[in-house]
Amino acid sequence: MKARVDDRPEEEEEVVAEADVAEHGRTADGETTSLDRRFFMQLQAFGGAGDTEQLVLSLEAAGVEGVLYEDVNDPRGVALLTLSETPDTFVSQLRGFLQSGPFAELEPKPDLTMLGRTYAIGHEQDLEDTLVERPRGRVLDPELRWAIWYPLRRAGSFEQLSRKEQNAILMEHGGIGMSFGRAGLGYDIRLACHGLDKADNDFVVGLLGPELHPLSIIVQRMRKTRQTSLHLERLGPFFVGRVAWQSAPA
């Protein structure tokens, strides 16, 4: 007869770890730090936008924090990137804003909707900069006129690798981004979207730069890495746009 849960030997009982939802980093001296703050970012795309100027005026009047892009692949397409430290913003102020005024007349493109949160991987020395200040500064930087946004889902094979193997793969991937960033050609925004994406993706990536060509090269280079070539299940769809409006940096 199968034993009831309360009849199992004590040594077989599962040890439940304490829930911890904070982001963690590490000081230069090796001390662990934590911060329970993060930015949520959402991209919503629309068609049927004949007059971008009216959209800009409505965004400024409402005090929306974010970016309006013109879709390079759709002459009547736009996308609105909004950011907030609380997801309530997207279903309260933003929801009401999009249901009225010029945005209410547009045609939503739900297949291009992306929602994610900033995160730390454990070695960052300045968590506030990593999670809040740097991502906000990047998307609102007037010099970074072009953007490519896309979701991705890792294959299960990546999760079966050891931590050492995972780190080596991520360093290869991250090295490309750092080299382009040092040259001022492109910067990335990486957001976790576990459980936040209707297609069950894992991450949302934004590539931002003063010109579009280097951003395309970043994607091309990353195709050759072990993570993309061996351990990705899905990549895209891609939104490609140029900044039409940005809110003032905080």
Report the location of each language-model feature.
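A short beta-turn/loop motif at secondary-structure boundaries
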Residues: 69-75, 193-199
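Conserved RNP beta-strands of RNA recognition motif
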Residues: 80, 205-207
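Short gly/pro-enriched beta-turn/loop segments at secondary-structure junctions
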Residues: 141-147, 187, 198-200
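Alpha-helical oligomerization segments
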Residues: 207-250
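Short S/T/G/P-rich N-terminal loop/turn motif that feeds into the first structured element of a domain
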Residues: 1-63, 75-76, 83-179, 210, ...
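A short glycine-rich, hydrophobically flanked beta-strand micro-motif that places a catalytic Asp/Glu
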Residues: 186-196, 204, 236
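A generic structural motif
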Residues: 66-73, 109-113, 229-243
